[in-house]
Amino acid sequence: MGVPSRGRLLLGLTPYCLAAGSFLLAALAAVRAEAAEVLPAAAAAGDKQAAAEAGPQDERQSPGDYPDDVDASAMTARINDLVREGWQAQGVRPSRQATDAEWCRRVYLDLAGRIPTVAELDSFTQRRSRLKRAELVDSLLGEEYAADYTRNWKTIWTNILIGRTGGTDRQSLTSREGMMDYLEASFAANKPYDALVRELVTATGDARPDMENYNGAVNFLIEKLDEGGVQAAAKTAQIFLGMSVQCTQCHNHPFNEHRQNQFWELNAFFRQTGVDRAMMDEDEDYDYATLVDRDFAGEGKMAGDARDSVFLEQVDGQLVDRDAAGVFSAPIFYELRNGQVQVAFPAFVDGTTLAERFAEQGAEFGNSGRLSQVNRRQELAKLLVDSPSLETAAVNRMWAHFFGYGFTKPIDDIGSHNPASHPELLAELAKAFRACGFDMRQLMRWIVLSDPYALSSTAAEGNEDDDPALGRAPLFSRFYVRQMQPEQLYESLLVATQADAKLKEAERDEMKTRWLGQFNTALGNDEGTESTVFNGSIPQALMMMNGDLVERACRTDAGGFLDKVANNAELSNREKINYLYRAALSRLPGKDETNICNELLAARYGDVVQTLQDVWWAVLNSNEFILVH
């Protein structure tokens, strides 16, 4: 009868659900059942010698005992204390500590964007140092893993700043390559977060790396300046201040303190900014785009037109504004719901106006649109980096990266209307982040060496209700299971399977772009948002099970991953199966899984290559593989 078809095997695998119990056991059982149907005699008789060789293994290593004083960081200790206070206040008992292998897989995914190799896993778990977790974190944040670290974090921040679809369209002004190159250099240099924000908000220059005046930082804003820079204002507030203000361009927010005038006063900072672009005649693709600063005369008026006592006049051959007192001014206008037109000048979200700041220095042109008098984006950058909201939003976002949930939900809507789950901890972490010079690696280190991050994802008696997915405020009494991001999954598949080993660089890039593109859906709305659809649906299950990458990973070609494992004379059949589990899941198979593998090996008449292929396919398509846990 031959090898069971993937289509027939899928019949036993349709309950593909990321939150299901042991999908892996179900997958292995389906493979075993199919093999038994094809080879009933062998399944009944078995290969006793092979089954005995693949004897049962311990399901988990014993959790290590890491005393509280392993990490000397005062902030890590403070995290532990304040989170523990929350447990005590709610009468919650935390889960056990994660095993070394569990923690190792977790921290590799979060810091390096991929699972560890078998060699890396063994190196860590076999180390006897009581400081080995801190030592591994230092390695992941240091030169040894610089390539993985920068690839991971440039990807994360490219997606934050321009989305997963930003710069992928042929007619896009954004250069995705330029954005990623800029962020790669920034994370490689451990650029302070405030400096990063300042550069992103004030950048001028060409978007593409091959242009003369290239400045990759311009790609954050270059496609957000249409319609008067509405998206520039909204995304700046959302990403860097943790403020969701998009809807206030039309009206006061119905559920929080954000007001319509605040949105347009923030928007006024971007009115001196423009985009120069050139279009290729042949296919109407944009050849280049350049972000520039230019004088802003004021919005929507002609010479002699009066609104709110603001007039345009000729100065040095240009139309500029003077108010009734003769001071230069360049206003913008917005409309209330009742149709009344209002004027807006640059003012920060805390109410600080440029006119007031300049007046304190004896200057009267804070509302001017002339670059020779004021550069509004430069002034906005100063206000941003001076604002305590900057570090608060950054810490909240970083915490959510490592725990799956921030102190607020959503993470970019912070305020009195949306109280933080741990306000004291958020405030202290934010203060410390500023005090350490906005050192992002330091912030990461505090978090990943904390007690909450080291907990098991398995609920304990008494903390079953600590589940933010049910709408409850997180207590962080266990590690919350979450899906890998598509980029993490892709890199982890490559690490586990070496599926790209024989590809050229151009082929690797094409395969990655095509694979990741399956998960992205742009949402057509005025917020410029998109969705990364990776939810365990049947189409995605089919893509994983039958896609090119998994198919390539499961080949038994000479010199391939499975061929090397199957023909490794130094490994027993048991050790070969163990190797597959460690390569994908960073653990050994449990007793039930081992029994199924034994039965499958018997059903295959001891055909190790075919058995390994079936087991490998099931492991890669398991919910456990695609989860951070």
What are these regions (language model features)?
Residues 1-12:
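N-terminal secretory signal peptides that target proteins for export/translocation
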Residues 12-29:
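Bacterial N-terminal signal peptides
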Residues 29, 33-35:
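Boundary at the C-terminal end of the N-terminal hydrophobic targeting segment
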Residues 35-66:
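Compositionally biased, proline/threonine/alanine/serine-rich low-complexity intrinsically disordered stretches
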Residues 56-298, 302, 391-430, 440, ...:
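Short, structured secondary-structure elements
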Residues 66-71, 275-371, 379-387, 438-440, ...:
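Electron-transfer interface patches adjacent to heme c in soluble/periplasmic c-type cytochromes
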Residues 193-195, 333, 377:
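Carboxylate/His-rich catalytic cores and anion/metal-binding grooves
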Residues 386, 429-434:
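Alpha-helical support elements that line or immediately flank enzyme active sites
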